[in-house]
């Protein structure tokens, strides 16, 4: 498949003239989440809650967080090497670009960067074959939304609300999938639940349900959401972390 055309993002990335990070709909994954989740159900306004020095959220209320390193534990699950590398990539990208704030799109760029992780393989199976081209499209979209506008130097890098909600939601998906660690496909599920993938690649139908089915096919086990009847099955594969 030819490189994806950047023009298809025109009008999808909602510009924000004064914001350092694009405000293209903030992700909110409610608990419990229904099997019929849609992007419109996941959207909420940015929170004004102060930053904390933890990746976890008190009382399951998601807040912005100081990002010093990828977490060794989030809520009740650990973090796989692949998921940690993806999140750390987003942190390093925010530092290198001098924005000092991680945006959800930067998390997606981490998936696109590590082409051998499970999430990247799933995206390819869903039609996003040119991962390098897609990475450049997301970078272009960040520029359009002023998401790479330099800020004054700060020692701490923070997560924007939407990015932090993606990571926290990913830990929930890991639990619902019966795993003791968050894997890259859980991060992908959280991005899909918030409509991040559909916003950036509207012509590929990367809806939550379609991504969910692809993840379940790859893993050999369905995601058990809180309001659904349990269906047991073996988990046949996890992330390939050979790129580390």
Curated annotation (Swiss-Prot):
Q: Which family does the UniProt entry place this protein in? A: Belongs to the ClpA/ClpB family.
UniProt keywords (A-Z) are: Chloroplast, Plastid, Transit peptide
Q: What is the organism lineage in this UniProt record?
A: Eukaryota, Viridiplantae, Chlorophyta, core chlorophytes, Chlorophyceae
Protein name, per record: ATP-dependent Clp protease ATP-binding subunit CLPT4, chloroplastic
Q: Does the keyword Ribonucleoprotein apply?
A: no
Reading the lineage from the top rank, the first entry is: Eukaryota
Q: Where is the transit peptide?
A: 1-64
Q: Where in the cell is it found?
A: Plastid, Chloroplast
Where in the sequence does UniProt note compositional bias of the Low complexity kind?
30-48
A GO cellular component term found in this entry reads: chloroplast
Where is the stretch described as Disordered? 30-55, 220-244
Its annotated function is as follows:
Accessory protein regulating the assembly of the plastid Clp protease system.
């Amino acid at each position: 498949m030819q490189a994806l055309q950047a023009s298809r993002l025109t009008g999808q990335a909602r510009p924000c003239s004064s914001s350092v990070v694009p405000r293209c709909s903030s992700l909110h994954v409610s608990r419990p989440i229904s099997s019929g989740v849609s992007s419109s159900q996941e959207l909420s306004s940015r929170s004004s809650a102060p930053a904390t020095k933890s990746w976890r959220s008190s009382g399951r209320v998601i807040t912005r967080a100081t990002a010093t390193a990828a977490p060794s534990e989030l809520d009740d699950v650990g973090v796989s090497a692949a998921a940690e590398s993806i999140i750390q990539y987003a942190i390093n990208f925010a530092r290198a670009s001098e924005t000092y704030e991680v945006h959800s799109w930067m998390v997606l760029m981490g998936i696109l960067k590590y082409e051998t992780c499970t999430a990247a393989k799933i995206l390819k199976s869903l039609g996003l074959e040119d991962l390098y081209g897609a990475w450049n499209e997301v970078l272009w979209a960040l520029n359009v939304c002023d998401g790479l506008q330099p800020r004054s130097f700060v020692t701490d890098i923070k997560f924007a609300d939407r990015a932090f909600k993606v990571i926290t939601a990913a830990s929930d998906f890991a639990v619902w999938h019966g795993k003791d660690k968050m894997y890259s496909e859980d991060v992908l599920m959280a991005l899909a639940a918030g409509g991040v993938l559909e916003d950036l690649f509207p012509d590929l139908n990367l809806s939550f349900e379609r991504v969910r089915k692809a993840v379940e096919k790859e893993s050999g086990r369905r995601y058990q959401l809180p309001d659904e009847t349990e269906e047991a099955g073996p988990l046949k594969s996890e992330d390939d972390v050979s790129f580390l």
